[in-house]
Amino acid sequence: MSQQEVCPLNLFQSAQGTGRVCMRVCVCERGRELAVLYRAAMGNAQKKGPGYREGGGPNSQPGTPGRRRSHGLNNAANSKEVPGSSPAANGSLPAGKSQDEPQGPGSAGESCNLDAPCGALPPPLARLKNQGNMLFKNGQFGDALEKYTQAIDGCIEAGIDSPEDLCVLYSNRAACFLKDGNSADCIQDCTRALELHPFSLKPLLRRAMAYESLERYRKAYVDYKTVLQIDISVQAAHDSVHRITKMLIEQDGPDWREKLPEIPAVPLSAQQHRKEEPSAELLQARAERAEQEKARKAEARFTILKQEGNELVKNSQFQGASEKYSECLAIKPNECAIYTNRALCFLKLERFAEAKQDCDSALQMEPKNKKAFYRRALAHKGLKDYLSASTDLQEVLQLDPNVQEAEQELEMVTNLLRESLLANAQG
């Protein structure tokens, strides 16, 4: 391979210190790695859109009879199957294998019916196409290219009006060119295939890879983005867009998008994996499930916070406990017990006004809550409102006469109230 030729399959690895993509790697040294990358990239484009065999559309322009035969990677020895690699090396279908597309190398043991019909092609041309597929499958890319070229030339010379079959032939030959490192001819054949069948995924993906190998990053970016409009699940296109974006930012600066060619809008009819609009019932069911899941998570979080707060109270860490209870109330603002728990923390921290406020909130929810009355009485006591404290303690004893703490506090508060009244009278 001369230095002017582009490496048939690119490692797409950044060169040290340059940020540039290394596009020329010797096949004899890195053949295995290159083959793995190509299979990984093309193996993602496995499905065709409904109702076509990568064909359709207007007739193409005349081909190029007498196209030279390529001799880069034209035999199985130069393209050995890599263990564990995808069988869809060129983007062929792994299931329901079609003879419209060549299968990846490494499956030579499979039988191939060379006389199988191929669309509207007459038997001699169908046989050429099937032979090309078999040769490609065996890794003989140069020989496969010659068969596809003969089939293309035969279609043109015979005036066969079968754009579907001609599109696939161009796409298959483009796969050979890409395998053989001939990126320029790959681009040319992919463009012809796309003229026959616009927005055909495999020619777009192959052309994008060829553009990238030639460091024509803007055009590669456009083709990869078009591929993702057709089929969002093509991971190779996602990876390539991410990689090329970095290259374009380095090459063109922050305004790199303004220098891109226009990205075509793919019609809905050409898009794969499109999701149907969900029904109103389905949307409602989803919303209900989401709400239930949200409530479940909130309840679990509430329980954890409450337990953490209780543990902190046991360890006399009242500031931390009050914060945990505050988080609880953010989740469930109508939980009476949390207000009384936080009121206890505020009492210990001598934040009497806040303690009283929490007890007020608790009593609004539970008007006969003994803890709320008792702790509010202590808050009143801390605020030196002995009369209100006495009133709340009497409420506690009316609800439960056996609360000894309330009796003791009532006696203490009564004495404080008496002393306060005497002091005021003397003053």
UniProtKB/Swiss-Prot annotation:
Residues 46-113 are annotated as: Disordered. Keywords: Cytoplasm, Repeat, TPR repeat. Its main location: cytoplasm. Pfam families: TPR_1 (PF00515), TPR_8 (PF13181). It comes from the Eukaryota. The lineage of its organism: Eukaryota, Metazoa, Chordata, Craniata, Vertebrata. InterPro entries: CiliaryAsmbly_MitoImport, TPR-like_helical_dom_sf, TPR_rpt. This is Sperm-associated antigen 1A. It is found in: Cytoplasm; Dynein axonemal particle. TPR repeats lie at residues 125-158, 167-200, 202-234, 302-335, 336-369, 371-403. It comes from Danio rerio. May play a role in the cytoplasmic assembly and/or trafficking of the axonemal dynein arms. GO terms for biological process: axonemal dynein complex assembly. Disruption phenotype: Morpholino knockdown of the protein causes increase incidence of dorsal curvature and hydrocephalus. The keyword Cell membrane does not apply. GO terms for cellular component: cytoplasm; cytosol; dynein axonemal particle.
